[in-house]
Each structure stands twice: as C-alpha cells, then as structure tokens.
C-alpha cells in the first residue's frame, strides 16, 4: 500500500496504490481472487473564506479477469454561509469495480444528490434559528437503460433552540424499484413483495434535547406508506453519562407494518442497551446488547481495550448471538483478540 500526498494552501491531492496478492499455492482460490489492485487520485479543495469546499476522485481496480467498467469516480461541492447552504454530489461506480480492502455497497450505478438549506435567524427568547431544507436524490442503472432504482424528494423543517434542543419535521416521497422479491417481515412462509416500482410518502417528527447535558434523549415518530402497505414507527434513545468514567444508553425502535392480503403484517422491535466504562487513560470496557424479534435474535458484544503505548492497543472481544426463545443454544460464540503496535 503506497500513498503520495501533496497539499498546497487550500488544495490537497492524494495519489495511492493498493495491492492485494495471493502468496503460496491453493486450489481453493479462483483466478479472480489471485490479486486485486486499486489505484487512484483524490483531490480536495477549499476557498480561503471556507465558504466553498469540494472534492473529486477517480479510482480504478485491476483483477486477473479484465473488465471494462472497473472504475469508481465522483465529485462533490459544498457552499455554506450564515443564511444559505448548498450541497451537491455525483458518483458513478462501474459494475466491474472491485476493492478487496474496502466495502462497496452498490455497483453499476449512477447517483446524484442535491440539497439546499435556507436558514432564518429569529430574534426570540428561546429560538435561535429556523431552517428549511429541500433535497433530491436518485440512483440509476446505466447498463439497464438508466433504470431508476431509487428516487427521493424530501423537505426538512427544523427549529433550533438556544438551549441547543432541536425539533425537526421531515416529509419525504421516496421511490424504490425492487429488482428481486422482498420478504419484509422475514417470517417463514410469508409471501414476499413482488418485483416492481413503489412510491411510499412518509412523515417524521423528531425532538432531541441538549446533547451536552449529562442526561440526553431523542424521540421520533413516523407514519406513511411502505411499498404496497403502511408503516407507523416510533423510536427513542436515552443516554446518561458520568464524566469521565461511565456512559450508558438505550435505543428502542418499533415499526408496525401493515400490508394488504395475502401479504403478512408484523410489529418489529429493536432494543439495544449500551454500557461503557473508562477505568483510566489506558483501560476501557464497552458492552453492547441487541435484541430483535426478527428471527428472535439476541446479540452480546463485550470489548476490553488496553492502550499500552501511543496509538497501540490490545483488544479482547467476546461475541455471543442467541435465539431469544432458547438462550441455552448459542448461534455464534467467539472470543477474539487483536494487537496493534505503532512503531
């Protein structure tokens, strides 16, 4: 892995080359897995007054099997002032682009996103400012006659209080094209939603208090269509901390999905408590539990971190995943350790 970085004033250029190649002989590895090489350039820029900023990149991958569309490229531009904010992004990823040392969510797509924010500064005792933010996003498949896979028109209305609390009202009108059948409830025997395009407008209202306080909370309710049915949601997050030794939080979300017959209807729960301890500047312990009634799964993750030298850590991680209806039969149980040392 090699990098070459050059920064001048408010511009920065990064040229990189990453090589992953098989060592030794193994009949279990096919030709495409023998090696993977990615090279490219990233270019970042910013104006002197910091109102304008942006970046562009071009990456290309090389494998044993030659591909014509093994690229990933994009550009984004941001303008931000006291009253206005504009952000635009364009990304194109070829179907043949591969990066073994990274995660590529979707390939063979063209994506565009644009957002405009207008801020109004209010001279009142409690309100700091009000903002209205319309946005538009769409994703197409160029190799399928530019078939629209996702499209979303949305508008957000926010009130920011001087207490640092926030009230947000969001309306969105998304469109999704399902290129394969989708079992929403994931129940055995449930009839999946068929292939096709779906519009499902929805409305969300959320409120959070001052996140600098020792006790913080966030609540959100939502309602709208969901593919060929409806969905009503509620979400809450509660957090408490005793600086600098203790932090805990609880995430709860519930989605009530109603689909027309013969499709299934379900109430989906997700509960996730988290507890973190900081014993000193070198020893940390974090614990995370998650329960979901999708598959009746219960997961436990516990990680102990020891920073024995600057930027050098030893991790001991315990994972346990259960079927909640029978906690004595673990699905996955593991104990892992990781050592990193900075020379």
Where are these regions (language model features)?
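Aromatic-lined, polymer-binding surfaces characteristic
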Residues: 1-45
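Exposed, low-structure sequence patches enriched in small/polar residues
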Residues: 34-36, 48-343
